[in-house]
Protein backbone atom coordinates (compact mmCIF):
# COMPACT_ATOMS: atom_id res chain seq x y z
CA UNK A 1 0.00 0.00 0.00
CA UNK A 2 1.32 3.44 -0.93
CA UNK A 3 0.02 6.98 -1.03
CA UNK A 4 0.22 9.91 -3.43
CA UNK A 5 -1.22 13.39 -3.09
CA UNK A 6 -3.18 15.56 -5.50
CA UNK A 7 -3.16 19.31 -4.96
CA UNK A 8 -6.94 19.61 -4.94
CA UNK A 9 -9.51 20.51 -2.32
CA UNK A 10 -13.27 20.48 -2.00
CA UNK A 11 -15.11 21.96 -4.96
CA UNK A 12 -17.67 23.69 -2.74
CA UNK A 13 -16.64 27.36 -2.50
CA UNK A 14 -16.67 27.87 1.28
CA UNK A 15 -14.87 24.71 2.51
CA UNK A 16 -12.47 25.04 -0.43
CA UNK A 17 -11.55 28.54 0.72
CA UNK A 18 -11.30 27.34 4.34
CA UNK A 19 -8.66 24.81 3.33
CA UNK A 20 -6.74 26.91 0.79
CA UNK A 21 -6.87 30.38 2.34
CA UNK A 22 -8.20 30.38 5.90
CA UNK A 23 -7.53 34.11 6.28
CA UNK A 24 -10.42 34.91 3.94
CA UNK A 25 -12.99 33.24 6.21
CA UNK A 26 -11.35 33.42 9.65
CA UNK A 27 -13.95 35.89 10.97
CA UNK A 28 -16.54 33.08 10.90
CA UNK A 29 -14.50 30.96 13.31
CA UNK A 30 -12.93 31.10 16.75
CA UNK A 31 -9.55 29.49 16.11
CA UNK A 32 -7.02 29.08 13.31
CA UNK A 33 -6.52 25.32 12.69
CA UNK A 34 -3.00 25.90 11.32
CA UNK A 35 -1.52 27.44 14.50
CA UNK A 36 -0.48 25.33 17.49
CA UNK A 37 -0.91 28.32 19.82
CA UNK A 38 -4.61 28.36 18.98
CA UNK A 39 -4.93 24.79 20.26
CA UNK A 40 -3.11 25.78 23.44
CA UNK A 41 -5.53 28.68 23.91
CA UNK A 42 -8.48 26.38 23.34
CA UNK A 43 -7.01 23.85 25.75
CA UNK A 44 -6.80 26.44 28.53
CA UNK A 45 -10.37 27.55 27.83
CA UNK A 46 -11.76 24.01 28.07
CA UNK A 47 -9.78 23.05 31.18
CA UNK A 48 -11.22 26.07 32.99
CA UNK A 49 -14.83 24.94 32.47
CA UNK A 50 -16.89 23.07 35.11
CA UNK A 51 -16.67 19.29 34.81
CA UNK A 52 -19.15 17.99 37.40
CA UNK A 53 -21.30 16.21 34.83
CA UNK A 54 -18.37 14.24 33.39
CA UNK A 55 -18.64 11.58 36.10
CA UNK A 56 -22.22 10.73 35.10
CA UNK A 57 -21.38 10.99 31.41
CA UNK A 58 -18.33 8.75 31.76
CA UNK A 59 -20.39 6.07 33.50
CA UNK A 60 -22.84 6.11 30.60
CA UNK A 61 -20.03 6.05 28.03
CA UNK A 62 -18.44 3.08 29.77
CA UNK A 63 -21.68 1.06 29.71
CA UNK A 64 -22.44 1.95 26.11
CA UNK A 65 -18.95 1.25 24.76
CA UNK A 66 -18.64 -2.03 26.65
CA UNK A 67 -21.92 -3.03 25.03
CA UNK A 68 -20.34 -2.31 21.65
CA UNK A 69 -17.40 -4.60 22.47
CA UNK A 70 -14.75 -1.92 22.97
CA UNK A 71 -11.10 -2.53 23.87
CA UNK A 72 -9.14 -1.63 26.99
CA UNK A 73 -7.77 1.55 25.44
CA UNK A 74 -11.28 2.93 25.01
CA UNK A 75 -12.11 2.18 28.66
CA UNK A 76 -8.88 3.87 29.73
CA UNK A 77 -9.79 6.97 27.71
CA UNK A 78 -13.24 7.08 29.35
CA UNK A 79 -11.56 6.87 32.75
CA UNK A 80 -9.36 9.85 31.85
CA UNK A 81 -12.50 11.77 30.90
CA UNK A 82 -14.14 10.77 34.19
CA UNK A 83 -11.17 12.17 36.12
CA UNK A 84 -11.25 15.45 34.20
CA UNK A 85 -7.78 14.74 32.81
CA UNK A 86 -8.62 14.59 29.11
CA UNK A 87 -9.75 16.82 26.29
CA UNK A 88 -11.48 15.42 23.22
CA UNK A 89 -11.26 15.54 19.46
CA UNK A 90 -14.76 14.81 18.20
CA UNK A 91 -16.35 13.83 14.93
CA UNK A 92 -19.81 12.50 14.15
CA UNK A 93 -22.03 10.93 11.54
CA UNK A 94 -25.46 9.42 11.03
CA UNK A 95 -25.32 5.67 11.69
CA UNK A 96 -25.51 4.27 8.16
CA UNK A 97 -25.85 0.54 7.58
CA UNK A 98 -22.50 -1.30 7.50
CA UNK A 99 -20.96 2.07 8.60
CA UNK A 100 -22.31 4.02 5.60
CA UNK A 101 -20.10 5.84 3.05
CA UNK A 102 -16.31 5.61 3.14
CA UNK A 103 -15.96 9.13 4.52
CA UNK A 104 -17.35 7.87 7.85
CA UNK A 105 -14.25 5.69 8.16
CA UNK A 106 -12.03 8.61 7.15
CA UNK A 107 -13.65 10.82 9.79
CA UNK A 108 -12.77 8.25 12.44
CA UNK A 109 -9.20 8.00 11.14
CA UNK A 110 -8.85 11.77 11.13
CA UNK A 111 -10.18 12.06 14.67
CA UNK A 112 -7.86 9.38 16.04
CA UNK A 113 -4.91 10.88 14.17
CA UNK A 114 -5.56 14.44 15.31
CA UNK A 115 -6.06 13.35 18.93
CA UNK A 116 -2.75 11.49 18.84
CA UNK A 117 -0.97 14.44 17.21
CA UNK A 118 -2.32 17.00 19.69
CA UNK A 119 -1.56 14.76 22.68
CA UNK A 120 2.10 14.87 21.70
CA UNK A 121 2.24 18.54 20.74
CA UNK A 122 0.33 19.81 23.78
CA UNK A 123 1.68 17.21 26.22
CA UNK A 124 -1.89 16.57 27.40
CA UNK A 125 -4.29 13.67 27.20
CA UNK A 126 -6.49 14.12 24.14
CA UNK A 127 -8.92 11.32 23.32
CA UNK A 128 -10.89 10.62 20.12
CA UNK A 129 -14.71 10.62 20.35
CA UNK A 130 -17.25 9.61 17.70
CA UNK A 131 -20.73 11.09 18.02
CA UNK A 132 -23.28 8.62 16.63
CA UNK A 133 -26.09 10.73 15.18
CA UNK A 134 -28.68 8.32 16.54
CA UNK A 135 -31.41 10.96 16.86
CA UNK A 136 -31.48 11.57 13.11
CA UNK A 137 -34.72 10.38 11.49
CA UNK A 138 -33.78 10.36 7.80
CA UNK A 139 -34.08 6.60 7.29
CA UNK A 140 -33.91 6.90 3.49
CA UNK A 141 -30.44 8.41 3.76
CA UNK A 142 -28.93 5.64 5.87
CA UNK A 143 -30.75 2.48 4.76
CA UNK A 144 -28.52 1.61 1.78
CA UNK A 145 -24.95 1.31 0.58
CA UNK A 146 -23.29 1.16 -2.83
CA UNK A 147 -20.99 -1.69 -3.83
CA UNK A 148 -18.30 -1.10 -6.51
CA UNK A 149 -18.71 -3.34 -9.57
CA UNK A 150 -17.14 -3.35 -13.04
CA UNK A 151 -20.33 -1.80 -14.43
CA UNK A 152 -20.56 0.89 -11.79
CA UNK A 153 -22.02 1.24 -8.30
CA UNK A 154 -24.69 -1.27 -7.29
CA UNK A 155 -27.13 -0.18 -4.59
CA UNK A 156 -28.28 -2.62 -1.93
CA UNK A 157 -30.95 -1.56 0.54
CA UNK A 158 -31.97 -2.72 3.99
CA UNK A 159 -35.50 -4.13 4.03
CA UNK A 160 -38.28 -2.39 5.91
CA UNK A 161 -39.29 1.18 6.57
CA UNK A 162 -40.36 2.82 9.83
CA UNK A 163 -43.95 4.03 10.04
CA UNK A 164 -42.94 7.63 10.71
CA UNK A 165 -40.07 10.00 11.55
CA UNK A 166 -38.46 7.70 14.11
CA UNK A 167 -34.90 8.35 15.25
CA UNK A 168 -32.43 5.79 13.93
CA UNK A 169 -31.41 5.01 17.50
CA UNK A 170 -34.94 3.77 18.16
CA UNK A 171 -35.38 1.61 15.03
CA UNK A 172 -34.98 -2.15 15.59
CA UNK A 173 -32.91 -4.02 13.02
CA UNK A 174 -35.12 -5.65 10.39
CA UNK A 175 -34.39 -8.95 8.66
CA UNK A 176 -31.00 -8.62 6.94
CA UNK A 177 -31.18 -11.88 4.95
CA UNK A 178 -31.86 -10.17 1.61
CA UNK A 179 -29.12 -7.60 2.24
CA UNK A 180 -26.60 -10.35 2.95
CA UNK A 181 -27.73 -12.35 -0.08
CA UNK A 182 -27.16 -9.36 -2.38
CA UNK A 183 -23.83 -8.62 -0.72
CA UNK A 184 -22.63 -12.21 -1.18
CA UNK A 185 -23.71 -12.24 -4.83
CA UNK A 186 -21.83 -9.02 -5.62
CA UNK A 187 -18.54 -9.82 -3.88
CA UNK A 188 -15.97 -12.39 -5.11
CA UNK A 189 -15.40 -15.51 -2.95
CA UNK A 190 -11.94 -14.46 -1.83
CA UNK A 191 -10.09 -12.93 1.09
CA UNK A 192 -12.00 -12.16 4.28
CA UNK A 193 -15.49 -12.47 2.78
CA UNK A 194 -16.82 -15.33 4.92
CA UNK A 195 -15.56 -13.76 8.15
CA UNK A 196 -17.03 -10.41 7.09
CA UNK A 197 -20.47 -11.92 6.47
CA UNK A 198 -20.36 -13.62 9.88
CA UNK A 199 -19.35 -10.35 11.55
CA UNK A 200 -22.30 -8.55 9.98
CA UNK A 201 -24.71 -11.33 11.01
CA UNK A 202 -23.42 -11.49 14.58
CA UNK A 203 -23.45 -7.74 15.22
CA UNK A 204 -26.92 -7.35 13.70
CA UNK A 205 -28.21 -10.12 15.97
CA UNK A 206 -26.61 -8.59 19.08
CA UNK A 207 -27.62 -4.96 18.47
CA UNK A 208 -30.90 -3.53 19.76
CA UNK A 209 -31.22 -0.92 17.01
CA UNK A 210 -29.55 0.50 13.89
CA UNK A 211 -27.38 2.91 15.89
CA UNK A 212 -25.99 0.10 18.04
CA UNK A 213 -25.32 -2.03 14.96
CA UNK A 214 -23.36 0.84 13.47
CA UNK A 215 -21.45 1.27 16.74
CA UNK A 216 -20.57 -2.42 16.96
CA UNK A 217 -19.17 -2.52 13.42
CA UNK A 218 -17.21 0.70 13.91
CA UNK A 219 -15.89 -0.57 17.24
CA UNK A 220 -14.69 -3.76 15.57
CA UNK A 221 -12.81 -1.78 12.91
CA UNK A 222 -11.24 0.69 15.37
CA UNK A 223 -10.98 -1.41 18.54
CA UNK A 224 -7.24 -0.86 18.98
CA UNK A 225 -7.34 2.94 18.79
CA UNK A 226 -9.26 3.96 21.91
CA UNK A 227 -12.10 5.56 19.96
CA UNK A 228 -14.98 6.42 22.31
CA UNK A 229 -18.54 6.33 20.93
CA UNK A 230 -21.33 8.48 22.32
CA UNK A 231 -25.04 7.93 21.74
CA UNK A 232 -26.91 11.19 22.42
CA UNK A 233 -30.34 9.51 22.37
CA UNK A 234 -29.77 7.71 25.67
CA UNK A 235 -31.82 9.33 28.49
CA UNK A 236 -28.82 9.68 30.81
CA UNK A 237 -27.04 11.78 28.18
CA UNK A 238 -30.11 13.89 27.42
CA UNK A 239 -30.51 14.72 31.13
CA UNK A 240 -27.20 16.61 31.10
CA UNK A 241 -28.44 18.92 28.35
CA UNK A 242 -31.82 19.77 29.94
CA UNK A 243 -30.80 23.32 30.89
CA UNK A 244 -29.61 23.95 27.34
CA UNK A 245 -32.97 22.92 25.88
CA UNK A 246 -34.69 25.07 28.50
CA UNK A 247 -32.82 28.17 27.38
CA UNK A 248 -33.59 27.53 23.69
CA UNK A 249 -37.29 27.30 24.51
CA UNK A 250 -37.68 30.12 27.03
CA UNK A 251 -35.66 32.67 25.03
CA UNK A 252 -37.17 31.86 21.62
CA UNK A 253 -36.73 33.17 18.95
CA UNK A 254 -33.18 34.19 19.98
CA UNK A 255 -31.34 31.21 18.43
CA UNK A 256 -33.13 31.57 15.10
CA UNK A 257 -32.44 35.31 14.99
CA UNK A 258 -28.74 34.68 15.55
CA UNK A 259 -28.74 32.09 12.76
CA UNK A 260 -30.47 34.51 10.39
CA UNK A 261 -27.83 37.15 11.15
CA UNK A 262 -25.04 34.67 10.37
CA UNK A 263 -26.74 33.63 7.12
CA UNK A 264 -26.92 37.27 6.04
CA UNK A 265 -23.24 37.73 6.92
CA UNK A 266 -22.29 34.74 4.78
CA UNK A 267 -24.42 35.95 1.87
CA UNK A 268 -22.73 39.33 2.18
CA UNK A 269 -19.37 37.61 1.72
CA UNK A 270 -20.54 35.91 -1.46
CA UNK A 271 -21.24 32.42 -0.08
CA UNK A 272 -24.45 30.41 0.08
CA UNK A 273 -25.28 29.35 3.67
CA UNK A 274 -25.20 25.59 4.24
CA UNK A 275 -28.24 25.85 6.51
CA UNK A 276 -31.04 28.03 5.23
CA UNK A 277 -32.60 29.74 8.22
CA UNK A 278 -36.26 28.67 8.21
CA UNK A 279 -38.68 31.26 9.54
CA UNK A 280 -40.00 30.61 13.07
CA UNK A 281 -37.91 27.46 13.60
CA UNK A 282 -37.01 26.68 17.22
CA UNK A 283 -34.08 24.36 16.30
CA UNK A 284 -35.30 21.60 18.58
CA UNK A 285 -37.31 18.47 17.86
CA UNK A 286 -39.64 16.73 20.25
CA UNK A 287 -40.85 13.12 20.29
CA UNK A 288 -44.63 12.84 20.10
CA UNK A 289 -46.75 10.10 21.67
CA UNK A 290 -45.93 7.78 18.74
CA UNK A 291 -42.19 8.32 19.12
CA UNK A 292 -42.04 10.36 15.91
CA UNK A 293 -39.55 13.23 15.80
CA UNK A 294 -41.30 16.54 15.04
CA UNK A 295 -39.72 19.94 14.44
CA UNK A 296 -40.85 22.77 16.72
CA UNK A 297 -41.70 26.35 15.73
CA UNK A 298 -42.19 29.60 17.62
CA UNK A 299 -45.06 31.75 16.33
CA UNK A 300 -46.96 34.61 17.97
CA UNK A 301 -45.74 33.83 21.46
CA UNK A 302 -46.49 30.09 21.29
CA UNK A 303 -44.47 27.01 20.40
CA UNK A 304 -46.03 24.34 18.19
CA UNK A 305 -45.31 21.42 15.91
CA UNK A 306 -45.36 22.11 12.16
CA UNK A 307 -49.05 21.51 11.55
CA UNK A 308 -50.09 23.31 14.73
CA UNK A 309 -51.87 20.32 16.28
CA UNK A 310 -49.84 20.71 19.48
CA UNK A 311 -49.07 24.05 21.15
CA UNK A 312 -47.35 25.16 24.34
CA UNK A 313 -46.39 28.37 26.05
CA UNK A 314 -42.69 28.95 26.60
CA UNK A 315 -43.18 28.18 30.26
CA UNK A 316 -44.99 24.91 29.63
CA UNK A 317 -42.45 23.56 27.18
CA UNK A 318 -39.54 24.89 29.23
CA UNK A 319 -40.81 22.93 32.23
CA UNK A 320 -41.06 19.81 30.06
CA UNK A 321 -37.42 20.31 29.01
CA UNK A 322 -36.36 20.16 32.65
CA UNK A 323 -38.61 17.30 33.75
CA UNK A 324 -38.35 15.10 30.64
CA UNK A 325 -35.35 16.13 28.50
CA UNK A 326 -35.40 12.76 26.70
CA UNK A 327 -38.47 14.07 24.83
CA UNK A 328 -36.24 16.54 22.96
CA UNK A 329 -33.37 16.44 20.49
CA UNK A 330 -31.38 19.17 18.73
CA UNK A 331 -31.36 19.93 15.02
CA UNK A 332 -28.21 20.43 12.94
CA UNK A 333 -27.79 23.96 14.34
CA UNK A 334 -28.00 23.05 18.02
CA UNK A 335 -26.21 19.68 17.86
CA UNK A 336 -22.68 21.19 18.05
CA UNK A 337 -23.78 23.28 21.05
CA UNK A 338 -25.13 20.17 22.79
CA UNK A 339 -21.84 18.44 22.02
CA UNK A 340 -19.94 21.34 23.60
CA UNK A 341 -22.15 21.13 26.68
CA UNK A 342 -21.37 17.44 27.14
CA UNK A 343 -17.67 17.22 26.27
CA UNK A 344 -14.45 19.23 26.65
CA UNK A 345 -14.02 19.61 22.88
CA UNK A 346 -10.60 20.71 21.70
CA UNK A 347 -11.34 20.23 17.99
CA UNK A 348 -14.01 18.89 15.68
CA UNK A 349 -13.07 16.87 12.57
CA UNK A 350 -15.49 18.05 9.90
CA UNK A 351 -16.56 17.21 6.38
CA UNK A 352 -17.09 19.99 3.83
CA UNK A 353 -20.77 20.48 4.67
CA UNK A 354 -19.99 20.66 8.39
CA UNK A 355 -17.28 23.27 7.82
CA UNK A 356 -19.93 25.38 6.11
CA UNK A 357 -22.58 25.04 8.79
CA UNK A 358 -20.13 25.54 11.68
CA UNK A 359 -19.35 28.88 10.04
CA UNK A 360 -22.91 29.95 10.92
CA UNK A 361 -22.71 29.02 14.60
CA UNK A 362 -20.20 31.41 16.20
CA UNK A 363 -22.90 33.79 17.45
CA UNK A 364 -24.97 30.88 18.80
CA UNK A 365 -22.01 29.44 20.72
CA UNK A 366 -21.42 32.86 22.28
CA UNK A 367 -25.11 33.13 23.21
CA UNK A 368 -24.69 30.02 25.36
CA UNK A 369 -21.45 31.38 26.86
CA UNK A 370 -19.37 28.93 24.83
CA UNK A 371 -16.72 29.09 22.15
CA UNK A 372 -16.68 27.10 18.95
CA UNK A 373 -13.91 24.45 18.91
CA UNK A 374 -11.14 24.30 16.34
CA UNK A 375 -12.63 23.02 13.07
CA UNK A 376 -10.32 20.54 11.35
CA UNK A 377 -11.04 19.07 7.88
CA UNK A 378 -11.36 15.31 7.70
CA UNK A 379 -9.04 13.32 5.39
CA UNK A 380 -10.17 13.24 1.77
CA UNK A 381 -9.19 9.85 0.27
CA UNK A 382 -9.61 7.85 -2.93
CA UNK A 383 -8.56 4.19 -2.85
CA UNK A 384 -7.21 2.43 -5.94
CA UNK A 385 -7.18 -1.36 -6.30
CA UNK A 386 -4.44 -3.16 -8.29
CA UNK A 387 -6.51 -3.71 -11.46
CA UNK A 388 -7.49 -0.05 -11.60
CA UNK A 389 -3.88 0.97 -10.97
CA UNK A 390 -2.78 -1.09 -13.98
CA UNK A 391 -5.39 0.60 -16.17
CA UNK A 392 -4.34 4.04 -14.91
CA UNK A 393 -0.75 3.21 -15.84
CA UNK A 394 -1.74 1.72 -19.21
CA UNK A 395 -3.61 4.84 -20.32
CA UNK A 396 -1.40 7.31 -18.42
CA UNK A 397 -4.39 8.82 -16.64
CA UNK A 398 -3.34 11.86 -14.54
CA UNK A 399 -4.15 11.49 -10.84
CA UNK A 400 -6.17 14.72 -10.97
CA UNK A 401 -8.72 12.90 -13.18
CA UNK A 402 -9.39 10.53 -10.29
CA UNK A 403 -10.90 13.39 -8.32
CA UNK A 404 -12.50 15.43 -11.09
CA UNK A 405 -13.68 12.70 -13.50
CA UNK A 406 -12.50 11.13 -16.76
CA UNK A 407 -15.08 12.45 -19.23
CA UNK A 408 -12.72 14.99 -20.78
CA UNK A 409 -9.82 12.52 -20.71
CA UNK A 410 -11.89 9.91 -22.62
CA UNK A 411 -12.83 12.44 -25.30
CA UNK A 412 -9.20 13.55 -25.63
CA UNK A 413 -8.13 9.90 -25.88
CA UNK A 414 -10.58 9.28 -28.74
CA UNK A 415 -9.26 12.34 -30.56
CA UNK A 416 -5.69 11.09 -30.19
CA UNK A 417 -6.71 7.69 -31.58
CA UNK A 418 -8.47 9.33 -34.52
CA UNK A 419 -5.82 8.92 -37.23
CA UNK A 420 -8.17 10.22 -39.95
CA UNK A 421 -9.08 13.43 -38.17
CA UNK A 422 -12.84 12.82 -38.40
CA UNK A 423 -13.85 16.20 -37.03
CA UNK A 424 -11.49 18.04 -39.39
CA UNK A 425 -12.77 16.04 -42.38
CA UNK A 426 -16.36 16.94 -41.65
CA UNK A 427 -15.57 20.58 -40.83
CA UNK A 428 -13.93 20.84 -44.26
CA UNK A 429 -16.93 19.11 -45.86
CA UNK A 430 -19.34 21.56 -44.23
CA UNK A 431 -17.19 24.49 -45.32
CA UNK A 432 -17.01 23.25 -48.93
CA UNK A 433 -20.72 22.48 -48.97
CA UNK A 434 -21.64 25.97 -47.76
CA UNK A 435 -19.33 27.56 -50.31
CA UNK A 436 -20.49 25.49 -53.34
CA UNK A 437 -24.16 25.55 -52.41
CA UNK A 438 -23.95 29.31 -51.95
CA UNK A 439 -22.47 29.72 -55.43
CA UNK A 440 -25.28 27.62 -56.95
CA UNK A 441 -28.01 29.53 -55.12
CA UNK A 442 -26.51 32.85 -56.17
CA UNK A 443 -26.59 31.80 -59.87
CA UNK A 444 -30.13 30.45 -59.69
CA UNK A 445 -31.62 33.34 -57.74
CA UNK A 446 -31.75 35.46 -60.91
CA UNK A 447 -34.65 33.20 -61.98
CA UNK A 448 -36.69 34.02 -58.89
CA UNK A 449 -35.82 36.06 -55.74
CA UNK A 450 -37.51 33.37 -53.57
CA UNK A 451 -34.78 30.90 -54.53
CA UNK A 452 -32.39 32.56 -52.04
CA UNK A 453 -34.71 31.69 -49.12
CA UNK A 454 -35.26 28.21 -50.49
CA UNK A 455 -31.48 27.82 -50.70
CA UNK A 456 -31.06 28.65 -46.99
CA UNK A 457 -33.56 25.96 -46.02
CA UNK A 458 -31.87 23.53 -48.40
CA UNK A 459 -28.49 24.24 -46.79
CA UNK A 460 -29.87 23.54 -43.32
CA UNK A 461 -31.15 20.15 -44.47
CA UNK A 462 -27.82 19.33 -46.13
CA UNK A 463 -25.89 20.28 -42.97
CA UNK A 464 -28.20 18.08 -40.88
CA UNK A 465 -27.47 15.15 -43.19
CA UNK A 466 -23.71 15.79 -42.89
CA UNK A 467 -23.96 16.11 -39.09
CA UNK A 468 -25.88 12.83 -38.90
CA UNK A 469 -23.25 11.14 -41.05
CA UNK A 470 -20.48 12.57 -38.84
CA UNK A 471 -22.16 11.22 -35.70
CA UNK A 472 -22.42 7.74 -37.25
CA UNK A 473 -18.74 7.81 -38.21
CA UNK A 474 -17.81 8.89 -34.66
CA UNK A 475 -19.91 6.05 -33.28
CA UNK A 476 -17.95 3.62 -35.48
CA UNK A 477 -14.74 5.17 -34.17
CA UNK A 478 -15.95 4.72 -30.58
CA UNK A 479 -16.93 1.13 -31.38
CA UNK A 480 -13.43 0.46 -32.71
CA UNK A 481 -12.07 1.76 -29.38
CA UNK A 482 -14.73 0.12 -27.22
CA UNK A 483 -12.28 -1.92 -25.15
CA UNK A 484 -10.31 1.19 -24.21
CA UNK A 485 -13.49 3.15 -23.48
CA UNK A 486 -14.82 0.39 -21.24
CA UNK A 487 -11.54 0.20 -19.34
CA UNK A 488 -11.44 3.97 -18.87
CA UNK A 489 -15.06 3.93 -17.74
CA UNK A 490 -14.13 1.22 -15.25
CA UNK A 491 -11.60 3.64 -13.75
CA UNK A 492 -14.36 6.25 -13.67
CA UNK A 493 -16.82 3.87 -11.98
CA UNK A 494 -14.29 3.01 -9.29
CA UNK A 495 -12.99 6.51 -8.57
CA UNK A 496 -15.84 8.86 -9.50
CA UNK A 497 -19.01 6.75 -9.18
CA UNK A 498 -22.16 8.58 -10.27
CA UNK A 499 -20.03 11.67 -10.84
CA UNK A 500 -19.24 11.96 -7.12
CA UNK A 501 -16.11 11.45 -5.08
CA UNK A 502 -15.62 7.79 -4.24
CA UNK A 503 -15.73 8.47 -0.49
CA UNK A 504 -19.32 9.75 -0.75
CA UNK A 505 -20.66 6.63 -2.51
CA UNK A 506 -18.87 3.38 -1.71
CA UNK A 507 -18.77 1.48 1.58
CA UNK A 508 -15.71 0.08 3.40
CA UNK A 509 -16.90 -3.54 3.69
CA UNK A 510 -16.30 -4.64 0.08
CA UNK A 511 -12.66 -3.64 0.62
CA UNK A 512 -12.47 -5.19 4.10
CA UNK A 513 -13.90 -8.46 2.78
CA UNK A 514 -11.40 -8.56 -0.07
CA UNK A 515 -8.24 -7.44 1.75
CA UNK A 516 -9.07 -8.06 5.43
CA UNK A 517 -9.68 -5.63 8.32
CA UNK A 518 -5.94 -4.93 8.49
CA UNK A 519 -6.39 -2.35 5.72
CA UNK A 520 -7.80 0.05 8.33
CA UNK A 521 -4.50 0.01 10.23
CA UNK A 522 -2.45 0.27 7.03
CA UNK A 523 -4.43 3.24 5.75
CA UNK A 524 -4.39 4.98 9.11
CA UNK A 525 -0.60 4.79 9.41
CA UNK A 526 -0.18 5.90 5.79
CA UNK A 527 -2.10 9.17 5.90
CA UNK A 528 -0.54 12.39 7.16
CA UNK A 529 -3.28 14.15 9.10
CA UNK A 530 -1.81 17.62 8.70
CA UNK A 531 -1.68 17.39 4.89
CA UNK A 532 -5.11 18.49 3.67
CA UNK A 533 -4.59 17.61 0.02
CA UNK A 534 -6.54 14.84 -1.71
CA UNK A 535 -4.98 11.48 -0.86
CA UNK A 536 -4.77 8.65 -3.41
CA UNK A 537 -4.08 5.31 -1.71
CA UNK A 538 -2.96 2.42 -3.91
CA UNK A 539 -3.70 -1.07 -2.56
CA UNK A 540 -1.20 -3.86 -3.20
UniProtKB/Swiss-Prot annotation:
Originating organism: Desulforamulus reducens (strain ATCC BAA-1160 / DSM 100696 / MI-1) (Desulfotomaculum reducens)
HAMAP family: BshC (MF_01867)
UniProt keyword annotations, A-Z: Coiled coil, Ligase
Class of enzymatic activity (EC top level): ligase
Gene name in the database record: bshC
EC number(s) from the headed UniProt entry: 6.-.-.-
UniProt entry tagged with the keyword Coiled coil: yes
GO molecular function: ligase activity
Covalent S-S links between cysteines: none
Nucleotidyltransferase among keywords: no
UniProt function note: Involved in bacillithiol (BSH) biosynthesis. May catalyze the last step of the pathway, the addition of cysteine to glucosamine malate (GlcN-Mal) to generate BSH.
Segments forming a coiled coil: 455-491
Name listed for the protein in its UniProt record: Putative cysteine ligase BshC
Protein family membership: Belongs to the BshC family.
One Pfam family named in its UniProt record: CC_BshC
Superkingdom of origin organism: Bacteria
Amino acid sequence: MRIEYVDSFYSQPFPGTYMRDFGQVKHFFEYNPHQLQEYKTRCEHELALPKEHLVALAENLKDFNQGLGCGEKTLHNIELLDQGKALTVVTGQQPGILTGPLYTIYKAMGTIGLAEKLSKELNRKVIPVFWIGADDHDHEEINHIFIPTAKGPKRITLAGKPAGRISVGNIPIPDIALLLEELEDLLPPIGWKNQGIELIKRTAHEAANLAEWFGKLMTFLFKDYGLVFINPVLPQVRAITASLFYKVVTTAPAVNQLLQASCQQMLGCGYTPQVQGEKDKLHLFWYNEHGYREALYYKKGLISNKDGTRTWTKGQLGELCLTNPAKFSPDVVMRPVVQEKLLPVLAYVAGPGEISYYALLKRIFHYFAMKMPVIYPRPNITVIEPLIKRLITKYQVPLSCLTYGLEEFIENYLQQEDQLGIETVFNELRGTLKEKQGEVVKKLSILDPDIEGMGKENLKRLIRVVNSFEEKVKQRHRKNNQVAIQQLQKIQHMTQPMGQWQERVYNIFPYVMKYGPGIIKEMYHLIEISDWRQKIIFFD
